Protein backbone atom coordinates (compact mmCIF):
# COMPACT_ATOMS: atom_id res chain seq x y z
CA UNK A 1 0.00 0.00 0.00
CA UNK A 2 1.22 3.51 -0.81
CA UNK A 3 0.08 6.44 1.33
CA UNK A 4 0.03 9.85 -0.36
CA UNK A 5 -0.34 12.33 2.52
CA UNK A 6 -1.04 15.92 1.50
CA UNK A 7 -1.19 18.87 3.91
CA UNK A 8 -2.68 22.21 2.84
CA UNK A 9 -2.13 25.62 4.41
CA UNK A 10 -4.95 27.82 3.17
CA UNK A 11 -4.78 31.56 2.65
CA UNK A 12 -5.93 33.28 5.85
CA UNK A 13 -8.17 35.69 3.93
CA UNK A 14 -10.42 32.92 2.59
CA UNK A 15 -14.01 33.21 3.73
CA UNK A 16 -15.83 30.43 5.56
CA UNK A 17 -17.72 29.71 2.33
CA UNK A 18 -14.47 29.41 0.37
CA UNK A 19 -13.03 27.08 3.01
CA UNK A 20 -16.17 24.94 2.84
CA UNK A 21 -15.91 24.91 -0.98
CA UNK A 22 -12.29 23.78 -0.70
CA UNK A 23 -13.22 20.97 1.70
CA UNK A 24 -15.98 19.87 -0.68
CA UNK A 25 -13.45 19.94 -3.52
CA UNK A 26 -11.08 17.70 -1.60
CA UNK A 27 -13.97 15.30 -0.94
CA UNK A 28 -14.52 14.94 -4.73
CA UNK A 29 -11.19 13.12 -4.91
CA UNK A 30 -12.99 10.14 -3.35
CA UNK A 31 -14.45 9.57 -6.82
CA UNK A 32 -11.08 8.64 -8.33
CA UNK A 33 -11.22 4.95 -9.22
CA UNK A 34 -7.44 4.39 -9.07
CA UNK A 35 -7.33 4.86 -5.30
CA UNK A 36 -8.32 2.42 -2.56
CA UNK A 37 -9.38 5.03 0.01
CA UNK A 38 -9.39 8.80 0.54
CA UNK A 39 -9.56 10.39 4.00
CA UNK A 40 -9.88 14.11 4.72
CA UNK A 41 -9.41 15.86 8.03
CA UNK A 42 -8.24 18.87 9.99
CA UNK A 43 -5.78 19.07 12.89
CA UNK A 44 -6.90 16.92 15.80
CA UNK A 45 -7.39 18.42 19.25
CA UNK A 46 -4.65 16.24 20.73
CA UNK A 47 -2.23 17.33 23.44
CA UNK A 48 0.13 19.99 22.12
CA UNK A 49 3.72 18.74 21.99
CA UNK A 50 6.82 20.13 20.26
CA UNK A 51 6.88 17.22 17.79
CA UNK A 52 3.32 17.79 16.53
CA UNK A 53 2.78 20.20 13.65
CA UNK A 54 -0.86 21.26 13.66
CA UNK A 55 -0.28 24.42 11.63
CA UNK A 56 -1.94 23.06 8.47
CA UNK A 57 -5.62 23.57 7.65
CA UNK A 58 -6.63 20.42 5.76
CA UNK A 59 -5.07 16.96 5.51
CA UNK A 60 -5.71 14.58 2.63
CA UNK A 61 -4.63 10.93 2.93
CA UNK A 62 -4.87 8.94 -0.31
CA UNK A 63 -4.32 5.18 -0.07
CA UNK A 64 -3.17 3.54 -3.32
CA UNK A 65 -2.42 -0.13 -3.89
CA UNK A 66 0.93 0.70 -5.51
CA UNK A 67 3.04 3.35 -7.23
CA UNK A 68 1.19 2.81 -10.53
CA UNK A 69 -2.15 3.58 -8.86
CA UNK A 70 -0.70 6.77 -7.34
CA UNK A 71 0.58 7.79 -10.80
CA UNK A 72 -2.93 7.21 -12.22
CA UNK A 73 -4.38 9.36 -9.42
CA UNK A 74 -2.05 12.23 -10.37
CA UNK A 75 -3.39 12.42 -13.95
CA UNK A 76 -7.02 11.59 -13.19
CA UNK A 77 -9.37 14.33 -14.49
CA UNK A 78 -10.93 14.77 -11.02
CA UNK A 79 -7.50 15.45 -9.49
CA UNK A 80 -6.47 17.80 -12.30
CA UNK A 81 -9.78 19.70 -12.01
CA UNK A 82 -9.34 20.01 -8.23
CA UNK A 83 -5.83 21.45 -8.59
CA UNK A 84 -6.91 23.87 -11.31
CA UNK A 85 -9.92 25.13 -9.36
CA UNK A 86 -8.27 25.47 -5.95
CA UNK A 87 -4.57 26.17 -6.57
CA UNK A 88 -5.10 29.82 -5.63
CA UNK A 89 -6.61 28.86 -2.26
CA UNK A 90 -3.41 27.64 -0.59
CA UNK A 91 -0.15 29.23 0.44
CA UNK A 92 1.65 25.94 0.96
CA UNK A 93 1.25 22.25 0.22
CA UNK A 94 3.46 19.59 1.81
CA UNK A 95 3.35 15.98 0.62
CA UNK A 96 4.72 12.85 2.24
CA UNK A 97 4.55 9.56 0.32
CA UNK A 98 5.28 6.28 2.09
CA UNK A 99 4.95 2.55 1.49
Residue positions per predicted region:
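Short, well-ordered beta-strand segments in beta-rich or mixed alpha/beta enzyme
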Residues: 2-10, 46-74
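N-terminal first-folded block
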Residues: 2-40
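A general secondary-structure junction signal
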Residues: 39-44, 97-99
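Absolute protein N-terminus
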Residues: 1-2, 99
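An amphipathic, aromatic/His-enriched active-site/gating alpha helix that lines ligand/cofactor pockets
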Residues: 20, 24-36, 54, 63-96
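Residue-identity detector for threonine
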Residues: 15, 28, 42, 46-47, ...
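Intrinsically disordered, low-complexity segments enriched in polar/charged residues with Gly/Pro
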Residues: 15-16, 49, 60, 82
Amino acid sequence: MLYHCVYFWLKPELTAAQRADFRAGVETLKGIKAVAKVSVGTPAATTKRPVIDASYDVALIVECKDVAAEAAYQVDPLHLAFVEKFKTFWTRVQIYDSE
